[in-house]
Amino acid sequence: MPNNRNNIFVDPRGEYYHDAYPAQQQEPPGLESRMQPRPDTGEESYRGHGRLLGRKALITGGDSGIGRAVAIAFAREGADIAVNYLPAEQPDAASLRTLLDGEGSRLTLLPGDLSDEQSCRRIVRDAVRALDGLDTLVLNAGTQHAVKEIAHLS
């Protein structure tokens, strides 16, 4: 489907950031708040329409990247959300709280390492308690490892 604005076709190749991204080094897990330019996760652009009113979601990896975009979209669509993130990413989670304060949805922040089974159990338990149940799981948490050639990706 073409990118339309006022029923006029707009070539999408000119719509987004095109400059070379400067090399940036951070120790994992890294913070989105330290990236330049900042990734567009919908902070300014996404407008909700109430499509998820009354829903309750747990979003893993919701402090940055795609997970942050999902958290913003779900909250602006009316869902109450619980966001899991690594404790080292607290600054990104705090900025998400600041962004979504006053938007009308409940936001529960749940730090924890998903590689630990007990942490997983606690996160789910705390999300269910905080939101009075769950309707949706967005299992987005992951790590990024840059490789120069796709053949080296596993």
Task: Locate the predicted segments by residue.
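Non-catalytic terminal and boundary segments that flank Rossmann-like NAD(P)-dependent oxidoreductase
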Residues: M1-L53
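The beta1-alpha1 cofactor-binding region of Rossmann-like NAD(H)/NADP(H)-dependent oxidoreductases
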Residues: Q90-P91, L110-R125
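Glycine-rich phosphate-binding loop signature in dinucleotide/nucleotide-binding domains
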Residues: A127-D132
